[in-house]
UniProtKB/Swiss-Prot annotation:
It comes from Stutzerimonas stutzeri (strain A1501) (Pseudomonas stutzeri). Consists of a catalytic RNA component (M1 or rnpB) and a protein subunit. It comes from the Bacteria. It catalyses: Endonucleolytic cleavage of RNA, removing 5'-extranucleotides from tRNA precursor. This is Ribonuclease P protein component. The lineage of its organism: Bacteria, Pseudomonadati, Pseudomonadota, Gammaproteobacteria, Pseudomonadales. PANTHER family: RIBONUCLEASE P PROTEIN COMPONENT.
Length: 131
């Protein structure tokens, strides 16, 4: 598999985004960001970014954040094969510098690839298994 970030590695249409939003099989919350993931039938992952003006005001910052996310995704895509992933930015994401962003997303990718079944559970659900 190529480590590039071509068209086939992106979520492009509203229908593709809607499929992930409507029925995510994994959720990974992070600091100032939320990852929604859904399994796909492909041999590679696909990425979609939702970074609005409300959460990141300046276009320069939005573009910087998108570049950093795409770059970390490119390096971790072998671990993420078979996922459609949507990243939703929240306020405060622009306050992180590039190394902090890269570090945060490396952890988020690892959490998603390592334990997809648990990420789909609600935050308190894992603790209630012995009830």
């Amino acid at each position: 598999m190529s480590r590039g970030f071509g068209r086939e590695k992106r979520l492009l249409t509203p229908r593709q985004f809607k499929a992930v939003f409507d029925s995510p099989s994994g959720k990974v919350p992070g600091r100032n960001v939320l990852l929604l993931a859904r399994e796909n039938d492909l041999q590679h992952p696909r990425l979609g970014l939702v970074i609005g003006k409300k959460s990141v005001k300046l276009s320069v910052e939005r573009n910087r954040i998108k570049r950093q996310i795409r770059e970390t995704f490119r390096h971790h895509q072998l671990e993420l094969a078979g996922w459609d992933i949507v990243i939703i930015a929240r306020k405060g994401l622009a306050d992180l510098d590039n190394p902090e962003l890269a570090k945060q997303f490396a952890k988020l990718w690892k959490r998603l690839s390592r334990n997809p079944a648990k990420t789909a559970a609600e935050p308190g659900a894992a603790n209630n298994t012995h009830a």
